[in-house]
Amino acid sequence: MTLIGKKLKTNNFFKMIKKLIVFNFIIFLISLNAVHSIEPDIFVQSTVNRASNILSKNISKDDKINELKAIAKETVDIRGVGFYSLGPVRKTLDENQKIKYSELFESYFLKSFSSRLAEYTNPEIEVQGKEVLNKNYTIVNSLLIGTTDRPEVKIDWRIYTKNPENPLIRDLIIEGLSLARTQKEEFSSILNSNDGDINILFKTLEEFSNK
């Protein structure tokens, strides 16, 4: 074999090695992403299990509420839910009003959510399936298991998955009724009854949170 032939063979060998290294690196990155991404159904089951553990603890109601608030702040897109609930009025707010609304809505939401959930004792929710709507949203289907005191309830979770490493809850659909949409209708009613005065809504949220 000539010297040129040996060089060509050597160059081809190193090119093949480089391709293999690049290929393996790409596979590694894909695997790494798969490890860190969280499937929406697993995320929901984990969240409800955490909440159930809190509700079954032998602690005061206030302590349960505080722990449930911490879970909600971590797993719910409170800001997204808040501005959805505000409807088209959100486009008319200045930056200071947006900041104030976000703060008031978070306090309102956390109190409303945690106070209602704290009334349950060890609720058992079973995840039954999921439907990927698009890259940003997945619906997770679940069932609140019935007891002698309450019937079973179908609960669908609208999960925001734009960041697969940090899925967030954007809505609960209970027996076909969207809580986010219901909230939006309530806020719209308050605004329509007060000539669209956002300060009246601010006052309503503040009064609820301070009760």
What are these regions, as identified by a protein language model?
Residues 1-17:
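N-terminal secretory signal peptides that target proteins for export/translocation
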Residues 20-31:
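Bacterial N-terminal signal peptides
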Residues 34-37:
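Boundary at the C-terminal end of the N-terminal hydrophobic targeting segment
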Residues 39-117:
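Early exported N-terminus immediately downstream of N-terminal targeting peptides
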Residues 90, 107-108, 146-147, 176-179:
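Solvent-exposed loop/turn segments at secondary-structure junctions
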Residues 111-153, 204, 208-211:
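Surface-exposed, charged secondary-structure patches
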Residues 152-181:
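Short beta-strand edge/turn micro-motifs at domain boundaries
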Residues 171-211:
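Low-complexity, intrinsically disordered terminal/linker segments enriched in charged
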